[in-house]
């Protein structure tokens, strides 16, 4: 199970840290995603264009999957492993009505948020516009 922590300094700056306790060994490398980078979601239903550049630890599976990172606006995000607790939309069950929101796979959520959001508030609003699958 992964752990994340934020610490606010006496100067008002925020520092972010995390552990990478996944169920399988990761071989992450440092990757940079440029502003304006375009990619298709894993469902291949939507083309996404990043507003912000970002840097983080990622693995080229392919595609390149970011475990964490920070963008040019200072917004940070991370994938945390919570076995048995995380639940996502099961769009393959046939019981879910047609949903017009773009499906974003859990493993591409960090890239999606870092590329499109400048703040936690903006990321929270963005989550209402997508379907995490």
Stretches with model-predicted labels:
Residues 98-133:
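Proteins synthesized as precursors that undergo proteolytic processing into mature forms
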Residues 1-101:
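A contiguous strand-loop segment
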